[in-house]
């Protein structure tokens, strides 16, 4: 769809994976699980329903793989209460999630070996970036309940391929 060279994608994914610390939960295995779940959601309903265009779909995949990039291992409440550098930098607003976005984008823009969007139209790059930012910021647990409700509302109107898919989605969200 975007003709991104395979080697560039492999380079990018390898570098993103290296940016995941060995935390008990927010680690590369968790990122791969979220990426896989995003793939299942996209290909078992969202594309068929016309909910996603290509740029947004790419944004979903990138947000999934980057959503906990360089995670500190501490939750936002702890970072804010302890006045951590991340909390100070991001003015106590979703410090982890803002850091994940900023860190991942800093990485992606740092080398032509993994800067895949350089050949995209400016408008598409802006749409992609906005989607990634919105999706990663939505992973803040303070926003999770509202996001889950919204997701359930959208997915409940989607025509899923079978009852098992609907049960899986309802169990996850």
Where on the chain are the PLM-derived regions?
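Acidic/His-rich, divalent-metal-binding segments that scaffold phosphate/diphosphate chemistry
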Residues: 1-95
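Divalent metal-dependent catalytic cores for phosphoryl transfer on phosphate-bearing substrates
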Residues: 56-173
């Amino acid at each position: 769809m975007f003709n991104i060279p395979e080697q560039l994608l492999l380079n990018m994914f390898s570098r993103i994976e290296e940016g995941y610390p060995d935390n008990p939960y927010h680690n590369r295995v968790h990122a791969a699980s979220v990426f896989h779940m995003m793939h299942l959601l996209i290909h078992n309903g969202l594309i068929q329903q016309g909910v996603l265009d290509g740029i947004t779909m790419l944004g979903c995949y990138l947000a999934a793989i980057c959503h906990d990039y360089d995670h500190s291992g501490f939750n936002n409440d702890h970072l804010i209460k302890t006045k951590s550098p991340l909390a100070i930098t991001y003015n106590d607003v979703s410090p982890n999630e803002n850091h994940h976005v900023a860190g991942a984008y800093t990485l992606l823009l740092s080398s032509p070996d993994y800067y895949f969007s350089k050949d995209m139209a400016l408008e598409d790059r802006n749409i992609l970036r906005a989607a990634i930012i919105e999706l990663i910021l939505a992973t803040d647990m303070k926003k999770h309940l509202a996001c889950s409700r919204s997701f359930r509302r959208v997915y409940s109107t989607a025509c899923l391929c079978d009852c098992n898919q609907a049960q899986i989605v309802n169990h996850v969200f």
